[in-house]
Protein backbone atom coordinates (compact mmCIF):
# COMPACT_ATOMS: atom_id res chain seq x y z
CA UNK A 1 0.00 0.00 0.00
CA UNK A 2 1.57 3.28 -1.11
CA UNK A 3 -1.11 5.44 0.49
CA UNK A 4 -1.00 6.12 4.22
CA UNK A 5 -4.42 4.46 4.48
CA UNK A 6 -7.37 3.16 2.50
CA UNK A 7 -11.02 2.77 3.39
CA UNK A 8 -12.47 -0.72 3.79
CA UNK A 9 -16.13 -1.72 3.65
CA UNK A 10 -16.85 -4.68 5.96
CA UNK A 11 -20.00 -5.36 3.95
CA UNK A 12 -18.51 -6.09 0.52
CA UNK A 13 -14.81 -6.19 1.44
CA UNK A 14 -13.87 -3.49 -1.06
CA UNK A 15 -10.88 -1.19 -0.49
CA UNK A 16 -10.83 2.32 -1.95
CA UNK A 17 -9.14 5.72 -1.47
CA UNK A 18 -10.64 8.40 0.74
CA UNK A 19 -12.34 11.48 -0.69
CA UNK A 20 -14.00 12.40 2.59
CA UNK A 21 -16.09 9.31 1.87
CA UNK A 22 -18.87 8.49 4.34
CA UNK A 23 -20.61 5.55 2.64
CA UNK A 24 -19.66 2.47 0.63
CA UNK A 25 -19.90 3.31 -3.09
CA UNK A 26 -21.79 0.03 -3.57
CA UNK A 27 -24.44 1.03 -1.04
CA UNK A 28 -23.62 -1.46 1.73
CA UNK A 29 -25.25 -0.86 5.10
CA UNK A 30 -21.90 -0.84 6.87
CA UNK A 31 -19.54 1.58 8.59
CA UNK A 32 -16.38 2.11 6.56
CA UNK A 33 -13.08 1.49 8.35
CA UNK A 34 -9.59 2.80 7.84
CA UNK A 35 -6.83 0.34 6.96
CA UNK A 36 -3.43 1.87 7.72
CA UNK A 37 -0.18 1.02 5.98
CA UNK A 38 1.58 1.04 9.36
CA UNK A 39 0.39 -2.01 11.29
CA UNK A 40 2.45 -1.09 14.36
CA UNK A 41 1.59 2.06 16.24
CA UNK A 42 4.33 4.66 15.79
CA UNK A 43 4.31 7.81 17.90
CA UNK A 44 5.07 11.15 16.29
CA UNK A 45 6.71 14.15 17.95
CA UNK A 46 3.57 16.24 17.50
CA UNK A 47 1.18 18.02 19.89
CA UNK A 48 -1.85 16.45 21.51
CA UNK A 49 -3.82 13.90 19.55
CA UNK A 50 -1.46 14.15 16.59
CA UNK A 51 1.21 12.07 18.33
CA UNK A 52 -1.04 9.23 17.13
CA UNK A 53 -1.29 10.53 13.58
CA UNK A 54 0.05 7.27 12.09
CA UNK A 55 -3.40 5.87 12.93
CA UNK A 56 -5.44 8.95 12.05
CA UNK A 57 -6.90 9.52 8.54
CA UNK A 58 -5.03 12.77 7.98
CA UNK A 59 -1.74 13.80 6.39
CA UNK A 60 -0.81 16.93 8.35
CA UNK A 61 -1.59 18.17 11.84
CA UNK A 62 -3.07 21.12 13.69
CA UNK A 63 -1.16 23.21 16.20
CA UNK A 64 -3.51 22.28 19.02
CA UNK A 65 -2.07 20.64 22.12
CA UNK A 66 -5.14 18.73 23.28
CA UNK A 67 -5.30 14.96 23.65
CA UNK A 68 -6.36 12.25 26.10
CA UNK A 69 -4.40 11.85 29.34
CA UNK A 70 -4.08 8.47 31.10
CA UNK A 71 -3.10 7.88 34.71
CA UNK A 72 -3.36 5.20 37.40
CA UNK A 73 -6.25 5.93 39.74
CA UNK A 74 -5.52 5.79 43.45
CA UNK A 75 -8.50 7.28 45.27
CA UNK A 76 -11.36 5.84 43.21
CA UNK A 77 -9.50 2.56 42.74
CA UNK A 78 -9.06 2.21 46.50
CA UNK A 79 -12.72 3.05 47.10
CA UNK A 80 -13.85 0.33 44.66
CA UNK A 81 -11.22 -2.24 45.61
CA UNK A 82 -9.57 -2.23 42.19
CA UNK A 83 -5.81 -2.66 41.88
CA UNK A 84 -5.41 -1.78 38.18
CA UNK A 85 -7.75 1.08 37.30
CA UNK A 86 -6.55 3.35 34.51
CA UNK A 87 -8.46 6.60 34.00
CA UNK A 88 -8.16 8.24 30.60
CA UNK A 89 -9.31 11.82 31.02
CA UNK A 90 -10.46 14.08 28.21
CA UNK A 91 -11.12 17.53 29.56
CA UNK A 92 -9.41 20.44 31.27
CA UNK A 93 -7.04 19.42 34.06
CA UNK A 94 -3.69 21.17 33.55
CA UNK A 95 -2.01 19.46 36.52
CA UNK A 96 -2.53 16.14 34.74
CA UNK A 97 -1.74 17.55 31.30
CA UNK A 98 -5.41 17.73 30.28
CA UNK A 99 -5.76 20.67 27.91
CA UNK A 100 -9.09 20.19 26.17
CA UNK A 101 -10.39 23.66 26.86
CA UNK A 102 -14.00 22.82 26.00
CA UNK A 103 -13.79 20.10 28.68
CA UNK A 104 -15.02 17.31 26.40
CA UNK A 105 -13.56 14.37 24.47
CA UNK A 106 -15.45 15.68 21.46
CA UNK A 107 -12.30 17.65 20.66
CA UNK A 108 -10.75 14.28 19.74
CA UNK A 109 -13.35 14.05 16.97
CA UNK A 110 -13.37 17.65 15.84
CA UNK A 111 -9.64 18.10 15.23
CA UNK A 112 -9.04 15.26 12.72
CA UNK A 113 -12.44 15.80 11.09
CA UNK A 114 -11.73 19.44 10.24
CA UNK A 115 -8.29 18.48 8.95
CA UNK A 116 -9.61 15.53 6.94
CA UNK A 117 -12.16 17.68 5.11
CA UNK A 118 -9.48 20.22 4.23
CA UNK A 119 -7.23 17.48 2.84
CA UNK A 120 -9.71 15.08 1.25
CA UNK A 121 -12.80 17.12 0.45
CA UNK A 122 -14.14 20.61 -0.05
CA UNK A 123 -16.79 22.85 1.43
CA UNK A 124 -18.01 23.70 4.93
CA UNK A 125 -18.73 21.13 7.63
CA UNK A 126 -22.19 20.86 9.14
CA UNK A 127 -22.47 19.40 12.65
CA UNK A 128 -25.64 18.51 14.55
CA UNK A 129 -25.13 18.31 18.28
CA UNK A 130 -26.72 18.16 21.71
CA UNK A 131 -24.03 20.59 22.88
CA UNK A 132 -20.60 19.07 23.51
CA UNK A 133 -19.79 18.10 19.91
CA UNK A 134 -20.93 21.48 18.65
CA UNK A 135 -18.79 23.28 21.22
CA UNK A 136 -15.73 21.24 20.21
CA UNK A 137 -16.16 22.08 16.53
CA UNK A 138 -16.71 25.75 17.38
CA UNK A 139 -13.44 25.69 19.35
CA UNK A 140 -11.50 24.12 16.48
CA UNK A 141 -13.04 26.70 14.14
CA UNK A 142 -11.97 29.46 16.51
CA UNK A 143 -8.39 28.15 16.63
CA UNK A 144 -8.01 27.40 12.91
CA UNK A 145 -10.42 29.73 11.11
CA UNK A 146 -12.19 26.79 9.44
CA UNK A 147 -15.87 27.70 8.91
CA UNK A 148 -18.53 25.38 10.36
CA UNK A 149 -22.32 25.24 10.51
CA UNK A 150 -23.54 23.95 13.88
CA UNK A 151 -27.16 22.97 14.59
CA UNK A 152 -28.24 22.42 18.21
CA UNK A 153 -31.47 22.35 20.23
CA UNK A 154 -32.34 25.82 21.50
CA UNK A 155 -32.09 24.47 25.05
CA UNK A 156 -28.41 23.64 24.45
CA UNK A 157 -27.39 27.03 23.04
CA UNK A 158 -25.72 28.09 26.30
CA UNK A 159 -23.28 25.17 25.93
CA UNK A 160 -21.83 26.70 22.78
CA UNK A 161 -18.80 28.72 23.85
CA UNK A 162 -15.14 28.94 22.96
CA UNK A 163 -12.00 30.16 24.70
CA UNK A 164 -11.09 32.52 21.85
CA UNK A 165 -13.54 34.33 19.53
CA UNK A 166 -15.12 32.16 16.82
CA UNK A 167 -16.14 34.45 13.93
CA UNK A 168 -16.53 31.64 11.37
CA UNK A 169 -19.37 29.72 13.04
CA UNK A 170 -22.93 29.69 11.73
CA UNK A 171 -24.91 28.55 14.78
CA UNK A 172 -28.51 27.52 14.16
CA UNK A 173 -30.76 26.73 17.12
CA UNK A 174 -33.84 24.53 16.70
CA UNK A 175 -36.83 24.29 19.03
CA UNK A 176 -36.85 20.59 19.90
CA UNK A 177 -34.39 17.89 20.94
CA UNK A 178 -31.19 16.40 19.53
CA UNK A 179 -33.07 14.39 16.90
CA UNK A 180 -34.77 17.56 15.65
CA UNK A 181 -31.33 19.13 15.27
CA UNK A 182 -30.12 16.12 13.29
CA UNK A 183 -33.14 16.32 10.98
CA UNK A 184 -32.70 20.05 10.35
CA UNK A 185 -28.96 19.66 9.85
CA UNK A 186 -29.65 17.07 7.17
CA UNK A 187 -31.75 19.66 5.32
CA UNK A 188 -29.02 22.29 5.65
CA UNK A 189 -26.67 19.92 3.81
CA UNK A 190 -28.91 20.17 0.75
CA UNK A 191 -27.26 23.54 0.13
CA UNK A 192 -24.30 23.13 -2.26
CA UNK A 193 -21.05 23.70 -0.41
CA UNK A 194 -22.20 22.39 2.96
CA UNK A 195 -20.91 18.92 3.81
CA UNK A 196 -22.29 16.64 6.54
CA UNK A 197 -19.75 15.85 9.23
CA UNK A 198 -21.03 12.28 9.08
CA UNK A 199 -21.43 11.19 12.69
CA UNK A 200 -20.57 7.53 13.18
CA UNK A 201 -19.88 7.21 9.44
CA UNK A 202 -16.93 9.58 9.74
CA UNK A 203 -13.71 7.57 10.13
CA UNK A 204 -11.81 10.62 11.38
CA UNK A 205 -14.30 11.01 14.19
CA UNK A 206 -14.04 7.36 15.24
CA UNK A 207 -10.27 7.12 14.92
CA UNK A 208 -9.93 10.37 16.86
CA UNK A 209 -11.96 8.92 19.72
CA UNK A 210 -9.97 5.71 19.38
CA UNK A 211 -6.88 7.53 20.64
CA UNK A 212 -8.33 7.05 24.14
CA UNK A 213 -7.68 3.31 23.80
CA UNK A 214 -4.25 3.95 22.25
CA UNK A 215 -3.22 6.31 25.03
CA UNK A 216 -4.39 3.95 27.77
CA UNK A 217 -2.68 0.91 26.23
CA UNK A 218 0.60 2.79 25.89
CA UNK A 219 0.34 4.02 29.48
CA UNK A 220 -0.43 0.57 30.93
CA UNK A 221 1.75 -1.37 28.48
CA UNK A 222 -1.18 -3.59 27.57
CA UNK A 223 -4.81 -3.64 26.50
CA UNK A 224 -7.33 -3.44 29.35
CA UNK A 225 -9.54 -6.37 30.29
CA UNK A 226 -12.58 -4.10 30.50
CA UNK A 227 -13.50 -0.71 29.06
CA UNK A 228 -16.16 1.59 30.57
CA UNK A 229 -17.93 4.44 28.78
CA UNK A 230 -21.37 6.07 28.70
CA UNK A 231 -22.84 6.31 25.21
CA UNK A 232 -25.44 8.32 23.31
CA UNK A 233 -24.81 7.29 19.72
CA UNK A 234 -22.34 4.60 20.75
CA UNK A 235 -19.69 5.87 18.35
CA UNK A 236 -17.13 5.98 21.15
CA UNK A 237 -17.72 2.32 21.90
CA UNK A 238 -17.23 1.45 18.23
CA UNK A 239 -14.05 3.53 18.20
CA UNK A 240 -12.68 1.72 21.25
CA UNK A 241 -13.36 -1.67 19.63
CA UNK A 242 -11.70 -0.68 16.35
CA UNK A 243 -8.64 0.77 18.10
CA UNK A 244 -8.34 -2.37 20.24
CA UNK A 245 -8.41 -4.57 17.14
CA UNK A 246 -5.54 -2.53 15.68
CA UNK A 247 -3.58 -2.91 18.91
CA UNK A 248 -4.15 -6.68 18.90
CA UNK A 249 -2.82 -6.79 15.32
CA UNK A 250 0.17 -4.69 16.42
CA UNK A 251 1.16 -7.60 18.66
CA UNK A 252 2.74 -5.69 21.55
CA UNK A 253 -0.30 -5.06 23.74
CA UNK A 254 -2.00 -8.43 24.11
CA UNK A 255 -4.17 -10.74 22.05
CA UNK A 256 -7.56 -10.32 23.73
CA UNK A 257 -10.12 -7.61 23.03
CA UNK A 258 -11.33 -5.66 26.06
CA UNK A 259 -14.89 -6.33 27.15
CA UNK A 260 -16.97 -3.23 26.42
CA UNK A 261 -19.07 -2.03 29.38
CA UNK A 262 -21.34 0.64 27.89
CA UNK A 263 -24.00 2.61 29.74
CA UNK A 264 -27.00 4.86 29.16
CA UNK A 265 -28.93 7.19 31.44
CA UNK A 266 -32.42 6.16 32.59
CA UNK A 267 -35.13 6.55 31.53
CA UNK A 268 -33.80 6.86 27.94
CA UNK A 269 -32.00 3.56 27.34
CA UNK A 270 -32.92 2.18 23.88
CA UNK A 271 -29.64 0.36 23.30
CA UNK A 272 -29.71 -1.23 26.75
CA UNK A 273 -33.19 -2.61 26.10
CA UNK A 274 -32.31 -3.90 22.63
CA UNK A 275 -29.13 -5.56 23.94
CA UNK A 276 -30.86 -7.21 26.88
CA UNK A 277 -33.53 -8.52 24.49
CA UNK A 278 -30.83 -9.92 22.20
CA UNK A 279 -32.06 -7.83 19.28
CA UNK A 280 -29.96 -6.37 16.50
CA UNK A 281 -32.79 -3.94 15.77
CA UNK A 282 -34.04 -1.10 17.96
CA UNK A 283 -37.85 -1.17 18.12
CA UNK A 284 -38.91 2.40 19.00
CA UNK A 285 -42.21 1.54 20.69
CA UNK A 286 -40.47 -1.07 22.87
CA UNK A 287 -37.00 0.36 23.41
CA UNK A 288 -37.80 4.07 23.73
CA UNK A 289 -41.49 4.47 24.55
CA UNK A 290 -42.50 8.08 25.09
CA UNK A 291 -39.04 9.17 23.93
CA UNK A 292 -39.56 12.91 24.30
CA UNK A 293 -40.68 12.64 27.93
CA UNK A 294 -37.80 10.28 28.71
CA UNK A 295 -35.22 12.60 27.16
CA UNK A 296 -36.41 15.50 29.33
CA UNK A 297 -35.87 13.43 32.49
CA UNK A 298 -32.25 12.31 32.03
CA UNK A 299 -29.30 13.97 33.78
CA UNK A 300 -26.98 13.56 30.78
CA UNK A 301 -28.99 14.68 27.77
CA UNK A 302 -25.96 14.37 25.46
CA UNK A 303 -26.65 10.62 25.69
CA UNK A 304 -30.07 10.84 24.02
CA UNK A 305 -29.64 9.88 20.37
CA UNK A 306 -32.83 8.33 18.96
CA UNK A 307 -31.06 6.96 15.88
CA UNK A 308 -27.79 5.36 17.05
CA UNK A 309 -25.69 3.19 14.69
CA UNK A 310 -26.89 0.02 16.39
CA UNK A 311 -27.77 -2.51 13.70
CA UNK A 312 -25.42 -1.32 10.93
CA UNK A 313 -22.55 -3.66 10.04
CA UNK A 314 -19.62 -2.64 12.23
CA UNK A 315 -21.92 -0.72 14.59
CA UNK A 316 -22.57 -0.80 18.32
CA UNK A 317 -24.25 -4.21 18.34
CA UNK A 318 -21.28 -5.78 16.56
CA UNK A 319 -18.82 -4.07 18.91
CA UNK A 320 -20.61 -5.46 21.97
CA UNK A 321 -20.97 -8.91 20.43
CA UNK A 322 -17.31 -9.11 19.38
CA UNK A 323 -16.09 -8.15 22.85
CA UNK A 324 -18.58 -10.11 24.96
CA UNK A 325 -19.88 -6.77 26.16
CA UNK A 326 -22.37 -5.65 28.77
CA UNK A 327 -24.74 -2.67 29.01
CA UNK A 328 -26.00 -0.73 32.03
CA UNK A 329 -29.05 1.46 32.61
CA UNK A 330 -28.01 4.11 35.15
CA UNK A 331 -30.47 6.16 37.21
CA UNK A 332 -30.05 9.89 37.78
CA UNK A 333 -29.47 9.48 41.53
CA UNK A 334 -26.67 6.99 40.87
CA UNK A 335 -25.19 9.34 38.28
CA UNK A 336 -25.06 12.22 40.73
CA UNK A 337 -23.60 10.15 43.56
CA UNK A 338 -20.97 8.70 41.21
CA UNK A 339 -19.99 12.19 40.11
CA UNK A 340 -19.59 13.28 43.73
CA UNK A 341 -17.51 10.21 44.54
CA UNK A 342 -15.19 10.80 41.59
CA UNK A 343 -14.70 14.45 42.50
CA UNK A 344 -13.99 13.55 46.13
CA UNK A 345 -11.49 10.80 45.29
CA UNK A 346 -9.85 12.12 42.10
CA UNK A 347 -10.23 15.87 42.77
CA UNK A 348 -11.79 16.97 39.47
CA UNK A 349 -15.42 17.56 38.48
CA UNK A 350 -17.11 15.46 35.81
CA UNK A 351 -19.42 15.98 32.87
CA UNK A 352 -22.76 14.24 33.65
CA UNK A 353 -22.15 11.68 30.89
CA UNK A 354 -18.81 10.73 32.43
CA UNK A 355 -20.54 10.33 35.79
CA UNK A 356 -22.88 7.79 34.15
CA UNK A 357 -19.81 5.75 33.19
CA UNK A 358 -18.44 5.95 36.74
CA UNK A 359 -21.79 4.73 38.08
CA UNK A 360 -21.64 1.71 35.76
CA UNK A 361 -18.10 0.97 36.97
CA UNK A 362 -19.29 1.09 40.58
CA UNK A 363 -22.10 -1.35 39.80
CA UNK A 364 -19.78 -3.69 37.90
CA UNK A 365 -17.38 -3.79 40.85
CA UNK A 366 -20.17 -4.32 43.39
CA UNK A 367 -21.90 -7.06 41.39
CA UNK A 368 -18.73 -8.92 40.44
CA UNK A 369 -18.80 -8.25 36.71
CA UNK A 370 -15.13 -7.28 37.01
CA UNK A 371 -12.48 -8.68 39.33
CA UNK A 372 -10.33 -6.70 41.79
CA UNK A 373 -7.15 -7.47 39.83
CA UNK A 374 -8.58 -6.95 36.35
CA UNK A 375 -7.02 -4.21 34.26
CA UNK A 376 -9.79 -1.63 33.86
CA UNK A 377 -9.99 1.42 31.59
CA UNK A 378 -12.46 4.14 32.58
CA UNK A 379 -13.01 6.59 29.73
CA UNK A 380 -13.80 9.92 31.39
CA UNK A 381 -15.31 11.74 28.44
CA UNK A 382 -15.49 15.18 29.98
CA UNK A 383 -14.64 17.20 33.05
CA UNK A 384 -12.77 20.12 34.52
CA UNK A 385 -15.51 22.69 33.92
CA UNK A 386 -14.97 24.43 37.25
CA UNK A 387 -11.23 24.74 36.71
CA UNK A 388 -11.71 25.95 33.12
CA UNK A 389 -14.11 28.63 34.32
CA UNK A 390 -11.38 29.91 36.66
CA UNK A 391 -8.51 29.79 34.18
CA UNK A 392 -9.91 30.51 30.73
CA UNK A 393 -11.82 33.22 28.94
CA UNK A 394 -15.22 32.16 27.65
CA UNK A 395 -16.86 33.59 24.52
CA UNK A 396 -20.50 32.60 23.93
CA UNK A 397 -21.29 31.64 20.33
CA UNK A 398 -24.32 33.68 19.36
CA UNK A 399 -27.02 32.07 17.17
CA UNK A 400 -26.97 33.14 13.54
CA UNK A 401 -30.48 31.75 13.07
CA UNK A 402 -33.27 30.50 15.32
CA UNK A 403 -35.83 28.14 13.78
CA UNK A 404 -39.01 26.52 15.03
CA UNK A 405 -39.48 22.78 15.35
CA UNK A 406 -40.52 21.37 11.99
CA UNK A 407 -39.64 24.56 10.10
CA UNK A 408 -38.45 23.85 6.57
CA UNK A 409 -35.02 24.83 5.31
CA UNK A 410 -36.45 27.14 2.67
CA UNK A 411 -37.15 30.77 1.85
CA UNK A 412 -35.50 33.33 4.12
CA UNK A 413 -33.83 30.65 6.24
CA UNK A 414 -32.13 29.03 3.26
CA UNK A 415 -31.18 32.43 1.83
CA UNK A 416 -29.60 33.48 5.12
CA UNK A 417 -27.38 30.41 5.27
CA UNK A 418 -26.51 30.79 1.57
CA UNK A 419 -25.45 34.38 2.28
CA UNK A 420 -23.28 33.31 5.21
CA UNK A 421 -21.69 30.59 3.08
CA UNK A 422 -20.83 33.08 0.33
CA UNK A 423 -18.97 35.20 2.87
CA UNK A 424 -16.70 32.27 3.80
CA UNK A 425 -15.05 32.13 0.36
CA UNK A 426 -14.43 28.39 0.54
CA UNK A 427 -13.87 25.98 -2.33
CA UNK A 428 -17.10 24.21 -3.30
CA UNK A 429 -16.75 20.90 -5.13
CA UNK A 430 -18.86 20.68 -8.28
Swiss-Prot record:
Name the cofactor(s): pyridoxal 5'-phosphate
Q: Name one GO molecular function term.
A: cysteate synthase activity
Database matches in Gene3D superfamilies: 3.40.50.1100
Q: Which residues carry this modification: N6-(pyridoxal phosphate)lysine?
A: 106
Ranges in coiled-coil conformation:
none
Q: Which residues cross the membrane?
A: none
Question: Which keywords fit this entry according to its UniProt record?
Answer: Coenzyme M biosynthesis, Pyridoxal phosphate, Transferase
Any one Gene Ontology BP term: coenzyme M biosynthetic process
Where along this sequence does the record place binding of pyridoxal 5'-phosphate? 132, 381
Question: Domain of life here?
Answer: Archaea
Q: Does the keyword Chaperone apply?
A: no
The UniProt record lists the EC number as 2.5.1.76
Functional pathway: Cofactor biosynthesis; coenzyme M biosynthesis
The answer to keyword Transferase applying to this record is yes
Family classification:
Belongs to the threonine synthase family. Cysteate synthase subfamily.
Quaternary state and partners of this protein? Answer: Homotrimer.
What this chain does, per the entry, is described as:
Specifically catalyzes the beta-elimination of phosphate from L-phosphoserine and the beta-addition of sulfite to the dehydroalanine intermediate to produce L-cysteate.
What this protein is called in its record is Cysteate synthase
Organism name:
Methanoculleus marisnigri (strain ATCC 35101 / DSM 1498 / JR1)
Lineage of producing organism: Archaea, Methanobacteriati, Methanobacteriota, Stenosarchaea group, Methanomicrobia
